């Protein structure tokens, strides 16, 4: 997919992919409005600074799951231990479509991830 914008990326997805990826994008927009997503590495990504090494969260769609990517491998390892229904990929957690419980668990830990990078934003949670 050669999307130039987040809305274009979402428009290129099938209905199931679009529903789940859009839900995560909506969550990030509602809880962390100061983080603006952009397309990087062909997926919607929220940079915590100006460069990727300063931290990022991203989302991507695959055939049977969607992935939420994190720049911190140790955080991802801890997170995946509590998500037995999900597989861990390279710097990402793969959530099967329809697994709302795992998605909500990941969303609940986004603020913990942001604290690793001393991100000065605050969630409305």
PLM-predicted stretches and their roles:
Residues 1-125:
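Charge-dense, helix-prone N-terminal extensions
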């Amino acid at each position: 997919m050669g999307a130039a914008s987040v809305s274009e990326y979402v428009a290129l997805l099938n209905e199931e992919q679009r529903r789940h990826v859009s839900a995560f994008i909506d969550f990030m927009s509602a809880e962390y409005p100061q983080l603006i997503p952009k397309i990087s590495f062909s997926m919607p990504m929220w940079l915590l600074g100006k460069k990727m090494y300063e931290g990022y969260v991203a989302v991507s769609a695959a055939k049977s799951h969607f992935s939420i990517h994190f720049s911190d491998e140790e955080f991802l390892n801890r997170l995946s231990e509590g998500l037995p229904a999900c597989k861990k990929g390279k710097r990402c957690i793969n959530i099967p479509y329809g697994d709302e419980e795992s998605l909500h668990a990941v969303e609940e830990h986004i603020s913990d991830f942001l604290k690793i990078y001393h991100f000065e934003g605050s969630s409305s949670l």
